[in-house]
Amino acid sequence: MLRYYVMPLLLLVFLTSGAAGVTIEPDNPNYQYSGRIDFSNPKAPMMFWPGTSIRATFQGAVLKIILNDAHGKSFYSVFIDNDFEHPFIIECEAGEKVYDGPAGLTDDAHTLLLFRRTEASTGPTIFLGLDLKSGQALLEPPARPERRIEFYGNSITCGMGNEAPDSGDDDKMAEENNFLSYAAITARNLEAEYSCIAKSGIGILISWFDLIMPDYYYRLDPENSNSRWNFANYNPDAVIVNLFQNDSWLIKNLDPVPDSAAIVSAYIDFIGKIRSEYAEAKIFCTLGSMDATKSGSPWPGYIESAVVHKRAQGDENIEIYFFPFKNWSKHPRVRHHQEMADGLTQFVGVKMGWIPDDSTAVGFKDDAFLPDDL
C-alpha cells in the first residue's frame, strides 16, 4: 500500500491565491467524531485511543489539519474521498502544528477521514480544526453508521507491528496501524461505527506493567485512573473481547500462581463488568491469533468455561470465537489481520443478523481446550 508522509508546517495564517484561509473550529456540528474523545473543552477535543477518528466533508482544493500532540510520537492516517489504499500519514511533532493535506485536490466537495493509527502510549493529541480556502465551509458529513461495535484487547487489537517487515522487530509505532488491524477491518466490513479500547501488553490478571484491563477499560483518559468514560455516550450492538494472550505468558509470575478456577473467575468478573455497562449488547469472547490458541493451550478452555458459566447464569447473549494459531512467532502482520477479519466478519455478521449465514465460518472450538480440573 502506498503511503505519503506529511511533514508539519509552522502554525501560520496561510495564503492561497492571495486570500487568507478560514479555520473551521472543532465544535462545528458538521464534524463527525468516533471513539472515546475528551470534549471537556469543545474547541480542543483530545484523542487518546487507537482507532479514534474524525470525519468531515469539505469544499475546495485546500486542506490543512491543525493538531497539538503531547509528545510528537503519534501517527494519523488521512484519507480523502474513501481512498483507503493511498493514505497520507501525519507523523506528529510535539506541540501545535499545521499539517498540509494532500496536494492536487479539485475544487469540488471531498470527504475526509482522520484516523488515529497508534495507541494511547504515544500520548494524547488535541484536534484544533481544519484550515480551508477562504469562503469555504464544512458540508453535512456522511450519515453515521447505524451499527456500532467495540473492541477490548491488547497489542493484537492495537495492530502493533502489523506493518513491520516479516524479519523486523514489531515494536515501532510507525509500523503500528490500527486502521489495518483485524478489529478496524471487521468494523468496516460490517459497516459499523468503531470503538477500540486496547493497550499493548495488557491482560486480565497480569500485564507487562502494573495495570490490568479491569482497571483500564472504563477510562476516558487512559493515563488517569480517575478519568471515567460515560458509557451512555456509546452503546455498541456488539462487543468483542480479545484478551488472555499476555496472561498466558506471564501467569506464573504471580504469587501465588492462580489455578484454573481463579483464572476462569477473573474472566467471568471482567465480562460481568462489560455486561453491566452494555445490557443489550452481544458479547463475543475471542482469543488469538498468537500462541494462546496453539494446540494444547488451556487458555481457550478457560474462556469456554467462563462462557458456560455466564450462560448458566442466564446471559445467553454471549458467543465464543477463537482465531487459529498460524505458527507465527511475532505479532500478526497485515495479511494475518486480514485473515482474522475475514473469519470474524462472517461469524459476528451472522450472529448479529447483519449478513446471511452461508455456514463458511465457525469459531475455532475444541473440547481438548477444556482444563481437566474444572
Model-derived features: where do they sit?
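Hydrophobic h-region of N-terminal signal peptides that target proteins for export
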Residues: 10-18
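Conserved beta-strand scaffold positions in the cores of enzyme catalytic domains, especially
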Residues: 151, 194-196, 320-322
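Conserved SGNH/GDSL esterase-like catalytic core that processes O-acyl groups on lipids
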Residues: 49-51, 117-124, 162, 167-257, ...
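N-terminal secretory targeting modules
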Residues: 19-152, 157-175, 352-374
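Alpha-helical cap/lid subdomain in secreted, periplasmic
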Residues: 218-365, 369-370
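Bacterial N-terminal signal peptides that target proteins for export
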Residues: 1-7
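Conserved hydrophobic/aromatic pocket- or pore-lining residues that grip, position, or stack substrates
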Residues: 154, 186, 274
